[in-house]
Amino acid sequence: LGTQQSSMFGDSTHDGVFAMWYGKGPGLDRSIDAMRHNNLLGTSQHGGVLAVVGDDHAMKSTDVPAASETMFADLQMPMLYPASVQEIIDYSLYGWAMSRFSGAWTGLKIVADTVDAAAPVDGDPHRLKIVIPEFAFPDDGVHIRGGDRWVLQEPRLRQFKLPAALAFARANNLNQVVMQSPKPRIGIISSGKAAVDVRQALMELGIDGAQAADQGIVMLKMGMPFPFDADAVRDFAAGLEEIIVVEEKRRFLESRVRDALYDLP
């Protein structure tokens, strides 16, 4: 919180400070009160906060098999889920930019299988072209301010900050179709490490990209599971015969996919 207050008192020497919080699943549990209040208060215009949570599904180094998506959703905090070592770097940069733009903290879920891996990465700081979308913010903005009224914080978060995060994700193609077909029949929706596992499973079944396209298999990889982009899912689902949702631990994406598609004409 202090980093985001640095420019509020007229004596700062920098335009803003961006910050990172890190904890494993149990650490997130213990920090909920502070994070909920800080997400409601918001970030500074030139700051931003990235909340990195390590989910250890196999409990190799923690005492609970955490799955933090539901916690981020309850906090109403935008969350990104990188699928590779390269994406940990990329999504961190996107996450800070999203936090700065939307006025909300941004969560980053990482799992042991990814963060314990070794891989070559492109470290060029100018490789990413972050797009700042057009968005109709309220006249008084969405960032942290002194004397903020508590009763206004939740409406500001729900009506502006989360939609702004969604607009940012769309502008930067964080939810993208990674497998395409000229005649799509079967759609797979996944996120993070599970999306990598799906691709690996298909390869082990002898189904490469060309064969998947020929069989009508397409895949939507949700880089931002929350806030959930229902429009992206509806566009992806158009014309499909069947949709398979692959995710870890909880029915987080599945229930939202069902709600987005239920009772469509």
What are these regions (language model features)?
Residues 82-265:
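Flexible, low-complexity linker and terminal segments
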Residues 1-100, 111:
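Thiamine diphosphate
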